[in-house]
Amino acid sequence: MTLTEIIFVLTGTCAILVFGGKIASLIMMLITKLFCPLPEAFFTSLGKWAVITGGSDGIGRAYAEELSKQGMSVIIISRNQEKLDRAAKKIELNTGGKVKVIAADFTKDDIYGHITENIEGLDIGVLVNNVGILPSQIPCKLLETSDLEERIYDIVNCNVKSMVKMCRIVLPGMQQRRRGVILNVSSGIAKIPCPIYTLYAASKVFVERFSQGLQAEYISKGIIIQTVAPFGVSTAMTGHQKPDMVTFTAEEFVRSSLKYLKTGDQTYGSITHTLLGRIVQSIPTWVLQSETFQHHFQEYVKNRDRR
């Protein structure tokens, strides 16, 4: 066999393995959804409490409400006390569960002592690191970002540091009890080069790599650590997009994503978003990085937010 033939065979084999792996992951999701549902008491078996950052609205509140429906007491942490109180009342009314609130601004450095004091000693079975912010509502190039120095500081603190610090606070108890789940909310755009969302996308890549490494370190301790990477979810961050075949309500997405808790250290949270992720990842990088794509994507977000 000539060198050229060997190269062609190896290239074809690699392509088949990659494609086969993607098909296998979809089959695993279908099998899990249809034939391997989580036991009814799964979440309460992990511990009494669930802690959710960014839990006053959107995906965070949906996680809090769903975990409360599953029988857990929940702690929601967010910046605005008034929004926290409203969310807590709504969750308690809808589920009859116990809700505790902690007001904390995750763009700040000095909040973690306060958080630790309020959750220390609790039997925490689930941690959802959901809190996150965009550097600007309309995507733009890095140097066009308003108050760039402040935005850099806020993004690193809120999207990156908060996840690491919350894991640092909660993980020791989970390790001691040899049970627990940590869900770190990322984004589908972390899977591709994403100019004009550079800061945000890069922060979510950190979420994915940190979570993968942490899962490898602690899976033997009975702890599940998973990245959840949605695409379209109708929240304030996405301008309350109208739900459709691709865009989920926060409640729909959370219910779906929890079904795939045992499918590995990463999930898009739904079969629809998994297929979308495969399509997006197949787009050539030069297309995603082109000025034309950046312009049209920026215009799409502007028009979406005007609706």
Curated annotation (Swiss-Prot):
Its EC number is 1.1.1.64. NADP(+) binds at residues 47-76. It holds the Pfam family adh_short. The active site is at Y200 (proton acceptor). It is a single-pass membrane protein. The keyword Transmembrane helix applies. Pathway: Hormone biosynthesis; testosterone biosynthesis; Steroid metabolism. Keywords: Endoplasmic reticulum, Lipid biosynthesis, Lipid metabolism, Membrane, NADP, Oxidoreductase, Steroid biosynthesis, Transmembrane, Transmembrane helix. PROSITE patterns: ADH_SHORT (PS00061). One of its GO terms (biological process) is testosterone biosynthetic process. The chain crosses the membrane at residues 6-26. It is found in: Endoplasmic reticulum; Membrane. The keyword Membrane applies. InterPro entries: NAD(P)-bd_dom_sf (IPR036291), Sc_DH/Rdtase_CS (IPR020904), SDR_fam (IPR002347), VLCFA-Steroid_DH (IPR051019). Belongs to the short-chain dehydrogenases/reductases (SDR) family. Catalyzes the conversion of 17-oxosteroids to 17beta-hydroxysteroids in the presence of NADPH. Favors the reduction of androstenedione to testosterone. Testosterone is the key androgen driving male development and function. Cannot use androsterone and androstanedione as substrates. This is 17-beta-hydroxysteroid dehydrogenase type 3. The gene is hsd17b3.
